C-alpha cells in the first residue's frame, strides 16, 4: 500500500458567520482520503481502487451513499470497521472570522470511544502513513502496528492539545512531520513567536518530558 490514512469518518454540525449546516459528512479521514485520492487518481487509469487505504470505525448510522462516495473515489475501504449498534463519531463546532481556529462546542466519540484500529496486515509497511486528526491514543496504537512505515505524518488540533497533551507529545516524538496551524504551534510551545515556538517543538523542548 502506498498511502495509509487513519482518521475519523464523522458527521458534523458546523456554525460559521455566514451560515450553518447539520449532519454534514466530515471527519479527518474523509477529507484526507478524498484529497489524496484526487491527486493520486491523476496518475492512475480511470476507475478501480487506488493504492490508498483508509482505516476507521463507523456506526450503523453511517449513510450507504457516503460510504459509496469514498469507495467511488478509489479509496480501499478494507480498513473500515462497522460497529454493530454503534453511532458514528459526531462533532459540533464553530468557526469565526478568518476560520483559522476550530471552536469545539460538543464532541460525541461514540464508536471511537475506546476504539483500537485494526490496520490490515498487508498495510503495515506503507510508503506514507498519515495519522489524520484523531485522539492521540488512537494514533499511537496505529504506530505500534505500522512499524514498517517509511514516512509518517501527523495532524492534530487544539482539542487534543487541551485534553491529551501528554499522549500527543509521545506520538509526536515518533513521527517525521507534524501538520499544525499557527494557533496550535503557539498552544504547544506557549510562545507567541512562531520561529521560536516551531523550533522548540522540533527539538522536543515544548513536548512533555522536554528534550
Task: Briefly describe each language-model feature range.
Residues 147-151, 158-211:
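Conserved phosphate/ATP/ADP-binding segment of small-molecule kinases
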Residues 1-4:
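Extreme N-terminal starter segment of soluble prokaryotic enzymes
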Residues 59-61, 133-138, 157-161:
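Short beta->alpha connector loops
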Amino acid at each position: 500500500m502506498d498511502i495509509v490514512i487513519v482518521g475519523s469518518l464523522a458527521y458534523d454540525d458546523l456554525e460559521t458567520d455566514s451560515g450553518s449546516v447539520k449532519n454534514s459528512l466530515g471527519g479527518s479521514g474523509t477529507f484526507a482520503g478524498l484529497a489524496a485520492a484526487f491527486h493520486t487518481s491523476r496518475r492512475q487509469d480511470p476507475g478501480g481502487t487506488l493504492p490508498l487505504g483508509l482505516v476507521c470505525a463507523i456506526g450503523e448510522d453511517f449513510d450507504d451513499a457516503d460510504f459509496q462516495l469514498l469507495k467511488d473515489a478509489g479509496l480501499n475501504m478494507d480498513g473500515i470497521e462497522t460497529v454493530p449498534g454503534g453511532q458514528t463519531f459526531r462533532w459540533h463546532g464553530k468557526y469565526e472570522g478568518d476560520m483559522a481556529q476550530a471552536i469545539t462546542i460538543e464532541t460525541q466519540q461514540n464508536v471511537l470511544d475506546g476504539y483500537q484500529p485494526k490496520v490490515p496486515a498487508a498495510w503495515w509497511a506503507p510508503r506514507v502513513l498519515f495519522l489524520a486528526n484523531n485522539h492521540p491514543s488512537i494514533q499511537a496504537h496505529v504506530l505500534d502496528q505500522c512499524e514498517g512505515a517509511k514516512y509518517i505524518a501527523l495532524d492534530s488540533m487544539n482539542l487534543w492539545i487541551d485534553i491529551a497533551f501528554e499522549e500527543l507529545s509521545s506520538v509526536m516524538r515518533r513521527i517525521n512531520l507534524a501538520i499544525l496551524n499557527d494557533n496550535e504551534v503557539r498552544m504547544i510551545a506557549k510562545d507567541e513567536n512562531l520561529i521560536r515556538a516551531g523550533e522548540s517543538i522540533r527539538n522536543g523542548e515544548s513536548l512533555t518530558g522536554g528534550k
